[in-house]
């Protein structure tokens, strides 16, 4: 019996592998040094950094931080042991990654985003929706609710009456459903929270000022609702009781069957109209001063503005500055 031994295989490391091994070794050494110096466990340092960047904007070339434990992200560059801003915008931190989000930039959609859009074009079995991104979003006929909440396949008759659902110029609130390789996205309105917008005022603010949170739909005092979408489109409207009630979904669908695609606004009393105007002015005041837009900031700004009973007084820059200082304290 003859036994054939398999020759040993030798792996020759390439120059890139050697460089990677050296880089990993250096990185491990740096981490060990940081641990010995107490930098890795510096939660207090992270909290202090968050406080220092809160509500702050940076300009190109401005030092963001010189703390060695932070890593640079988009909108920054490393020089002389510090992280500097390469664009004008707001500083954001994810763990120890520091980035600067530009103030003037197109909205970049992400799956699950709550957005407000405007119907730009009606095509066969789909709508093109302007959401403030580089490309229009696509809303398929199969991605909407039919009147009455009926769950069935969309027929040719539905395609023929697409303009009775949405037509050019209509505003809607939807959710980003899918992201395609070319950068375009598809959206859907298959929820009672989404659909055509009525009974309100449309505003446009820089998307960078909208702070992402778990919820972007708020109910304020005075019978006013706000939809603060992440693409920088804001809707201030009359309070919708169905949206915040605990009635069953089936009951709500039956009640909304006739009004879900209506083009007529409901009757709005004068008190609510004034509150809608006041909230709209407050949002514009925050945006014009490059202040972050959140439920808390809008509420504080609104409450501080109540010292001026006349809405015309809110348009005076001096008064707006005073309100902003009180609201952000």
UniProtKB/Swiss-Prot annotation:
CDD domains xref list: KH-I_Rrp4_eukar (cd22525), S1_Rrp4 (cd05789)
Localization, UniProt: Cytoplasm; Nucleus
Keyword Nucleus among UniProt keywords: yes
Pfam family, any one: RRP4_S1
Chief place of localization: cytoplasm
Protein's UniProt keywords contain Cytoplasm: yes
This protein's GO CC annotations: chromatin; cytoplasmic exosome (RNase complex); cytosol; exosome (RNase complex); nuclear exosome (RNase complex); nucleus
Gene Ontology biological process: CUT catabolic process; exonucleolytic trimming to generate mature 3'-end of 5.8S rRNA from tricistronic rRNA transcript (SSU-rRNA, 5.8S rRNA, LSU-rRNA); nonfunctional rRNA decay; nuclear mRNA surveillance; nuclear polyadenylation-dependent mRNA catabolic process; nuclear polyadenylation-dependent rRNA catabolic process; nuclear-transcribed mRNA catabolic process; nuclear-transcribed mRNA catabolic process, 3'-5' exonucleolytic nonsense-mediated decay
Protein name, as recorded: Exosome complex component rrp4
Organism in which the protein naturally occurs: Schizosaccharomyces pombe (strain 972 / ATCC 24843) (Fission yeast)
């Amino acid at each position: 019996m003859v036994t054939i031994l398999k020759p040993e295989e030798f792996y020759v490391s390439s120059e890139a592998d050697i460089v990677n091994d050296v880089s990993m070794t250096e990185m491990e050494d740096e981490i060990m040094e940081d641990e010995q110096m107490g930098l890795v466990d510096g939660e207090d340092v992270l909290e202090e950094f968050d406080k220092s960047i809160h509500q702050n904007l940076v300009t190109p070339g401005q030092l963001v931080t010189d703390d060695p434990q932070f890593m640079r992200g988009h909108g920054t560059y490393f020089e002389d042991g510090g992280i500097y801003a390469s664009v004008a915008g707001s500083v954001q931190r994810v763990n120890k990654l520091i980035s600067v989000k530009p103030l003037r930039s197109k909205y970049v959609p992400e799956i699950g985003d709550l957005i407000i859009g405007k119907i730009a074009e009606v095509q066969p079995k789909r709508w093109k929706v302007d959401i403030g991104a580089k490309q229009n979003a696509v809303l398929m006929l199969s991605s909407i609710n039919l009147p009455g909440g009926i769950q069935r396949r969309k027929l040719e008759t539905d395609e023929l009456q697409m303009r009775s659902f949405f037509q050019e110029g209509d505003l809607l609130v939807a959710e980003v459903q899918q992201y395609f390789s070319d950068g375009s996205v598809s959206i859907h309105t298959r929820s009672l929270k989404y659909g055509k917008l009525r009974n309100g005022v449309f505003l446009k603010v820089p998307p960078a000022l909208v702070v992402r949170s778990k919820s972007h739909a708020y109910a304020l005092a005075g019978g006013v609702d706000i939809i603060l979408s992440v693409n920088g489109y804001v809707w201030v409207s009359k309070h919708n009781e169905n949206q915040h009630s605990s009635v069953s979904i089936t009951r709500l669908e039956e009640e909304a069957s006739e009004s879900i695609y209506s083009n007529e606004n409901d009757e709005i009393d004068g008190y609510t109209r004034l509150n809608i105007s006041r909230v709209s002015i407050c949002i514009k005041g925050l945006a014009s001063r490059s202040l972050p837009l959140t439920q808390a900031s809008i509420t504080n700004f609104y409450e501080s503005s109540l010292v001026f009973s006349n809405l015309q007084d809110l348009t005076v820059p001096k008064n707006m500055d005073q309100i902003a200082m009180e609201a952000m304290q």
